[in-house]
Amino acid sequence: MAKQIKGIAASDGVAIAKAYLLVEPDLSFDNESVTDTDAEVAKFNGALNKSKVELTKIRNNAEKQLGADKAAIFDAHLLVLEDPELIQPIEDKIKNESVNAAQALTDVSNQFITIFESMDNEYMAERAADIRDVSKRVLAHILGVELPNPSIVDESVVIIGNDLTPSDTAQLNKEYVQGFVTNIGGRTSHSAIMSRSLEIPAVVGTKSITEEVEAGDTIVVDGMTGDVLINPSDEVIAEYQEKRENFFKDKQELQKLRDAESVTADGHHVELAANIGTPNDLPGVIENGAEGIGLYRTEFLYMGRDQMPTEEEQFEAYKAVLEAMKGKRVVVRTLDIGGDKELPYLDLPEEMNPFLGYRAIRLCLDQPEIFRPQLRALLRASVFGKLNIMFPMVATIQEFRDAKALLEEERANLKNEGYEVADDIELGIMVEIPSTAALADIFAKEVDFFSIGTNDLIQYTMAADRMSERVSYLYQPYNPAILRLVKQVIEASHAEGKWTGMCGEMAGDQTAIPLLLGLGLDEFSMSATSILKARRLIRSLNESEMKELSERAVQCATSEEVVDLVEEYTKNA
């Protein structure tokens, strides 16, 4: 009998295939005490080592398939396996209480998970998920139980499961896995993000899919609407086959825009750039016709290792990106890291709210021994392309001045050492903090450009953690307050003959693009896979009409009014 279930649309596309149930393994165990505690500790450490080997393989495979920024989740998992704050209490529990390894692991990891989940904090929620995933793997090795392995699938299927861990998702074989559906998860969960990178249609958060589906059922997944159909009629299958064909045709049509200009119907040109994490992300940037790189996140150079990257290592990474972009602008964000990331070689304080604490430019100015090697590497690489440098989390004009002074010191040092340094490097800041937006006219006199980081600007302006379900309704990209701040920043930069870009998720949002175009945004930087859709939309719009739209939008009272207004202006685009 045909059924239809609604979930959260997580990754575009249509999948039609037989259901493959990802059965959760039996990880139950007896709570028996042990007499040989040394042997039990050895058993635990053996399971740890096997887990490290597995995760390293999965991480390397994920980097090849998805890029280093998506593989970074497994760097976090590997760090969990090295974390003495987790490992030592487990070993102590075995030795002091004669508890078996499985029970000790479960007790200690559950304590951490409970603590982290009780905090309304994005980082802590991710940390809890990391511990849960890693502990499950270690427990399976302790018990000698095999975890589900989606990579063994050898026929066209739709994966059905309670949830897909990052390691599950990274092992999906695109040749056979047509799509997946889960009980839990949201659009920003790790599995959803990875499914978009793999371009596998996905629907998450259905709550009950595993109870409704049996192995072998015919499943239709609509990753655009969040609809999941179980054993639909032949007529309905035919409709979705046509929808799938149209989806692929649309993708092919988009490819024709790869080398097209990002210009409105009335001749206004903007720049569409890509966000990247490492040089490994460059193929996607080039394939999707990016006109530059608007955000190069350098923190991935610092993660998944036990010592700070050397100046030479950083120089080679920056040089590779600049050379690959062949003279197109590359905007590099200096180190944006703090207490929310565990780096064993940095003595960072634990903070209740690391996103408002000791991080980014604050950390770099306080510890110039970390900052100077990065600045030197960037300056040395500057001769290999068109380099722009921006400082993150700048709250005051003095922070920008201090960062610029350090950079100029290192420029002078390098020239004295015989290095060549480009003399046309533009220096800018991320606008993520409301205080910076409020003083944009002051900053604009000294910086060369702004890049608006909307992910944080929205959170800080609305005082709402977007990962907290209870206040997620306040994470409103289209709120008139946000639009007014964006308008203020853009106008301040233009008054001084400077330019403004945007590198948050909002820059690639199909509802936001018409508004941003009307507000005068010069550069839109987004995930490489969003560029062609954004280009098509921009080419269908008139800048003059979008200016009128944005003028009306900033006078609205609510996000809903703004969305209705955008629909009114773009319905024929």
From Swiss-Prot:
> What keywords are annotated for this sequence in UniProt?
Cytoplasm, Kinase, Magnesium, Metal-binding, Phosphotransferase system, Sugar transport, Transferase, Transport
Keyword Magnesium among record annotations: yes
Its UniProt entry gives the catalysed reaction(s) as:
L-histidyl-[protein] + phosphoenolpyruvate = N(pros)-phospho-L-histidyl-[protein] + pyruvate
Residues reported in the UniProt entry to bind Mg(2+): E432, D456
GO terms, biological process:
phosphoenolpyruvate-dependent sugar phosphotransferase system
Active-site residues (renumbered): H190, C503
The positions annotated for binding phosphoenolpyruvate are N455, D456
PROSITE patterns documented for this protein: PEP_ENZYMES_2, PEP_ENZYMES_PHOS_SITE
Class of enzymatic activity (EC top level): transferase
UniProt-annotated location(s): Cytoplasm
- Give one Pfam hit by family name: PEP-utilizers
Entry cofactors: Mg(2+)
Against SUPFAM superfamilies, the record matches this protein to:
Enzyme I of the PEP:sugar phosphotransferase system HPr-binding (sub)domain, Phosphoenolpyruvate/pyruvate domain, Phosphohistidine domain
Q: What is its EC number?
A: 2.7.3.9
Under Gene Ontology molecular function, one entry of this record is: kinase activity
State the similarity comment: Belongs to the PEP-utilizing enzyme family.
Q: What else is known?
A: The reaction takes place in three steps, mediated by a phosphocarrier histidine residue located on the surface of the central domain. The two first partial reactions are catalyzed at an active site located on the N-terminal domain, and the third partial reaction is catalyzed at an active site located on the C-terminal domain. For catalytic turnover, the central domain swivels from the concave surface of the N-terminal domain to that of the C-terminal domain.
**What NCBIfam families does the entry give?**
PTS_I_fam (TIGR01417)
Its UniProt domain note says: The N-terminal domain contains the HPr binding site, the central domain the pyrophosphate/phosphate carrier histidine, and the C-terminal domain the pyruvate binding site.
The annotated subunit structure for this chain is: Homodimer.
Entry function: General (non sugar-specific) component of the phosphoenolpyruvate-dependent sugar phosphotransferase system (sugar PTS). This major carbohydrate active-transport system catalyzes the phosphorylation of incoming sugar substrates concomitantly with their translocation across the cell membrane. Enzyme I transfers the phosphoryl group from phosphoenolpyruvate (PEP) to the phosphoryl carrier protein (HPr).
Q: What is this protein called?
A: Phosphoenolpyruvate-protein phosphotransferase
- Organism, by scientific name, is Staphylococcus carnosus (strain TM300)
